[in-house]
Amino acid sequence: MRVLLTNDDGFDSVGMRVLRDVVSGHFAEVWVSAPARDCSAASRALSVRTPIKTHMRGEREFVVHGTPADSAVIGICEMTSTGKRPDLVISGINYGANTGFTVPYSGTIAAAAAAFDIGVPAIAISQQYNGKRCDNNVETSWQNSRKSVMALVSRLLRDTMWHGKCVMSINVPYSDVQGVKFAGHSCDDGHIKWDGPSMERREITSGDGRCVSYVFDDMRSPNSNDNASDTQLLEQGYIVVTPIGHSMTDHAILDKYCGLQ
């Protein structure tokens, strides 16, 4: 099998190095196409009508000056151009969980979704971190990902119920692993409200007058009251697997309006 690795934290991120180690020896060919810089929370953005500079690091590695979705699509196109379409795309391993309200913003999940959109089975993997996010992943232990990820990927590849029919998002806890659970993401019922990311505001005086600088810091999702949700199960120490599909329709509201027609 041929696998393409991508992410949103950047080509040289620690999570990508861990993912390379994890998949090494399990696939006939490993290709990498990832952003040149950290593109966290880039969601599904594509660089439309903009040249995307891409550096080649060997025949199977591409550093993309674009978004995570750009990186996934470019990687697939490069493989296809040599007659080697990927059998699987793995996006990650992200530094930080992608559960609940963070799912639509996640560049990690978006890169996997871009692959899924063009017919390639895709898995997104995220590693929960312990405490406040900091540079160089100092507070994150990747041990659980190293131990668990490849076994889960192999399990999904054998599973005829999945068979690439959606993006599979895997979240790995930083605490001792209690097992594996399948769950929906915790904003599905619409009852949980998010205050947005934590933000730092700075006033700046520059040559063109007074400006304000904003820094979005932490994208963690609020806790859900649903003990079976992805956010709660991850906090309880479970590896959480969430199937993510195309539809963004609120069918309950749609049915009410359709009933008035």
Curated annotation (Swiss-Prot):
Residues that, per the record, bind a divalent metal cation: D8, D9, S40, N94
Protein keywords: Cytoplasm, Hydrolase, Metal-binding, Nucleotide-binding
Any Gene Ontology CC annotation: cytoplasm
InterPro entries in alphabetical order: SurE, SurE-like_Pase/nucleotidase, SurE-like_sf
Major localisation: cytoplasm
Compartment list: Cytoplasm
Substrates-to-products reaction catalysed: a ribonucleoside 5'-phosphate + H2O = a ribonucleoside + phosphate
Top-level taxon: Bacteria
Cofactor note: Binds 1 divalent metal cation per subunit.
Cofactors: a divalent metal cation
Pfam families: SurE
Matches recorded under Gene3D superfamilies: Survival protein SurE-like phosphatase/nucleotidase
UniProt EC number: 3.1.3.5
GO molecular function terms attached to this record: 5'-nucleotidase activity; metal ion binding; nucleotide binding
Function, in words: Nucleotidase that shows phosphatase activity on nucleoside 5'-monophosphates.
The family this protein is said to belong to: Belongs to the SurE nucleotidase family.
NCBIfam families: surE
The protein's name: 5'-nucleotidase SurE
Species for this entry: Anaplasma marginale (strain St. Maries)
Designated gene of the protein: surE
